[in-house]
């Protein structure tokens, strides 16, 4: 299994909106992607920092979302609420 970790910095007054979009739009779209297992969003309300962790069956399925434009479409949904571009990383899951 693999994980994609995306770190965002949102305007603190927009965090509830970011959470709602993640829950109501981004996660349902992820569920339609082949190999998607699950997602979690961690937030720090004081700083506006958010960390999304999504789990995928394989590295190929994780990377397919980036190649197809899926990742970019999801980031575009919250981009107006961000204070800087997101960062993304991918890891093999050693222990689940």
Description of each model-found segment:
Residues 1-53, 57-69, 80-96:
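Short S/T/G/P-rich N-terminal loop/turn motif that feeds into the first structured element of a domain
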Residues 72-77:
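Low-complexity, intrinsically disordered Gly/Pro/Thr-rich segments
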């Amino acid at each position: 299994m693999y994980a994609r970790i995306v770190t965002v910095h949102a305007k603190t007054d927009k965090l509830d909106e970011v959470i709602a979009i993640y829950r109501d739009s981004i996660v349902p779209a992820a569920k339609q992607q082949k190999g998607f297992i699950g997602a979690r969003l961690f937030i720090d309300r004081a700083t506006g920092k958010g960390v999304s962790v999504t789990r995928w069956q394989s590295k190929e399925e994780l990377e397919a979302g980036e190649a197809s434009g899926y990742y970019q479409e999801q980031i575009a949904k919250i981009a107006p609420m961000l204070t800087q571009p997101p960062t993304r990383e991918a890891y093999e899951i050693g222990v689940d």
